[in-house]
Regions:
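Short, mixed-charge, low-aromatic patches
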Residues: 14-19, 42-47, 68-71, 148-159
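Electropositive phosphate-/nucleotide-binding environments in soluble metabolic enzymes
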Residues: 10-21, 52, 56, 80, ...
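Terminal amphipathic helices with adjacent charged low-complexity linkers/tails
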Residues: 1-44
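Short, charge-rich amphipathic segments
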Residues: 17-23, 45-48, 74-76, 127-139
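A broad, structural surface signal
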Residues: 3, 17-25, 60-64, 88, ...
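Accessory "access/gating" subregions that flank catalytic or transport cores
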Residues: 29, 37-102, 112-115
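Thiamine diphosphate
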Residues: 60, 81-161
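Ubiquitous "structural anchor" signal
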Residues: 31, 69, 137-139
């Protein structure tokens, strides 16, 4: 606060510092939740470990499944958080026959996956909450046609769209 406001407006710096301390103290002392959770540091034996995010692991699993089933993997998607990393990770596996398509909207994304399923590929599309809602009509088409297709719904951490 002093670095930002201290020289020109010491009164603003002091007011902001007091507000910060009051908020901190309130958060530490208010019993707003029934339980407190604390995650202790993991005790790992020495060795080599790989740090993998969930979307990255999902992408690796999809590539493996396509490879084991002797199918080309097609992923048509419109970038939307938090599903975007799946598209980004799958685009790194062109040498495994993975085809990715960044569509102009959610409807085009699912329709591209429907086309890939018609063509015999392991077809996927993915999105998050509002994107899944936009795909609804085309999902109905895929179901009526009984096309094998995977639809990924990556959940957001909160209620926001």
């Amino acid at each position: 606060m002093n670095d930002k406001f201290g020289k020109k407006r010491p009164d603003v710096a002091e007011a902001n510092t007091l507000a910060l301390k009051a908020g901190w103290n309130y958060g530490e002392t208010a019993e707003l939740f029934e339980r407190n959770y604390q995650v202790q540091p993991a005790h790992l034996t020495p060795g080599t470990y790989t740090n993998v995010m969930g979307n990255q692991a999902l992408a690796w699993g999809l590539v493996t499944a396509a490879n084991l089933s002797n199918k080309e993997l097609f992923y048509g998607s419109y970038p939307i958080t938090p599903a975007s990393p799946v598209l980004e990770e799958l685009s790194n596996f062109k040498n495994y026959g993975v085809k990715t398509f960044q569509a102009e909207d959610e409807i085009a994304a699912i329709c591209s996956a429907i086309g890939a399923a018609f063509g015999g590929s392991m077809a996927l599309t993915g999105s998050s909450g509002p994107g899944i809602a936009l795909k609804g009509e085309a999902m109905g088409l895929a179901m009526i046609l009984e096309l094998p297709m995977l639809i990924l719904k990556v959940q957001r951490g909160g209620p926001s769209t």
